């Protein structure tokens, strides 16, 4: 990309679209991101409606290049969100927004790209030693669903971010209690994916299964209330729910670390864990993470980091767009 082309490519439209909220921003210069706004997805019929309201708020700047991270597989032109009603054609959306270039990537691919640029002040380490340089990194995190990605080194300190749907792999129970919880979920849903438990709604599902076992008829409860009751000590059942949630996350994190050979560390993203970070440090997470029989020592050395950065998806999708535009301009 030439200097003149680079200057003319700003501002760039960035979006991180989840099942609950869509975050929008403008990259006004290289690595300078401003005007971050959060829009509830349910308030808008389409993604184009939401974008137009956002851009109108900032004077409808002329934009040629955009990138969206989305909590969904991105295969071909048509996008049907898994955890929301939005469905759209990428090309039709590009035209409706009068963009020259619009790319879409998986939201956790964006999270992974962001991690490649993070400072140590944006991370809290949970156990393990130091990262191995130029080794794969595992990236996952519970939110509306369970996002899963990874960073694979490709030389010169650069990484390729993986795009997948690891949150929808089949859940494997660790002990008798988790077998019971899995059976409860299977009766309700049939196939039980990992994100059935490792998500905001998953926390509620674990609670419901435990309450059912105890013969407790509970009123509808939110993930936030479960966390609050668990941390305050008001509800032993909520505390057990949170313990099991963190233990499950430990097992799944270890599975991903083994699959990728993630000696570069495991990175936990999303808004759930930071809400109870002090509890999480001493929760069953790390013990379960290292409980892998013959590979206990291998996992004990791998550091786990909780990501505290506020908008990693936005910063990650900016990296993806920059990479794409380098190729785009080189071919013009």
Swiss-Prot record:
This is Glucokinase. Belongs to the bacterial glucokinase family. Gene3D superfamilies: 3.30.420.40, 3.40.367.20. The keyword GTP-binding does not apply. One of its GO terms (molecular function) is glucokinase activity. Keywords: ATP-binding, Cytoplasm, Glycolysis, Kinase, Nucleotide-binding, Transferase. It comes from the Bacteria. Its EC number is 2.7.1.2. Its main location: cytoplasm. ATP binds at residues 15-20. It is found in: Cytoplasm. The keyword Translocase does not apply. GO terms for cellular component: cytosol. It catalyses: D-glucose + ATP = D-glucose 6-phosphate + ADP + H(+). GO terms for biological process: glycolytic process. InterPro entries: ATPase_NBD, Bacterial_glucokinase, Glucokinase.
């Amino acid at each position: 990309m030439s200097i003149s082309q680079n200057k003319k490519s700003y501002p760039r439209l960035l979006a991180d679209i989840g099942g609950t909220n869509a975050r929008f921003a403008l990259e006004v210069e290289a690595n300078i991101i401003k005007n971050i706004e959060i829009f509830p997805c349910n308030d808008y019929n389409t993604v184009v409606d939401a974008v137009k309201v956002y851009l109108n708020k900032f004077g409808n700047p002329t934009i040629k290049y955009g990138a969206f991270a989305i909590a969904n597989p991105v295969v071909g032109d048509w996008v049907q969100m898994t955890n929301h009603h939005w469905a759209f054609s990428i090309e039709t959306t590009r035209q409706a927004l009068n963009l020259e270039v619009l790319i879409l990537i998986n939201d956790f691919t964006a999270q992974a790209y962001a991690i490649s640029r993070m400072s140590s002040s944006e991370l809290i380490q949970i156990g393990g030693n130091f990262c191995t340089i130029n080794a794969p990194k595992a990236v996952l995190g519970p939110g509306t669903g369970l996002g899963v990605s990874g960073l694979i080194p490709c030389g010169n300190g650069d990484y390729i971010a993986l795009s997948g749907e690891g949150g929808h792999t089949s859940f494997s129970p660790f002990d008798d209690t988790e077998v019971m919880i899995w059976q409860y979920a299977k009766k309700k849903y049939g196939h039980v994916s990992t994100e059935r438990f490792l998500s905001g709604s998953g926390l509620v599902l674990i609670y419901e299964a435990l309450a059912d076992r105890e013969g407790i008829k509970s009123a509808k409860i939110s993930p936030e209330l479960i966390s609050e009751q668990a941390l305050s000590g008001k509800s032993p059942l909520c505390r057990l729910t949170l313990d099991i949630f963190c233990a499950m996350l430990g097992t799944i994190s270890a599975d991903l670390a083994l699959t990728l050979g993630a000696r570069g560390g495991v990175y936990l993203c999303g808004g759930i864990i930071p809400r109870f970070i002090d509890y999480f440090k001493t929760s069953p997470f790390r013990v379960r993470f290292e409980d892998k029989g013959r590979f206990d020592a291998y996992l004990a050395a791998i550091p786990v980091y909780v990501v505290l950065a506020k908008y990693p998806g936005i910063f990650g999708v900016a990296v993806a767009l920059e990479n794409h535009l380098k190729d785009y301009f080189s071919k013009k």
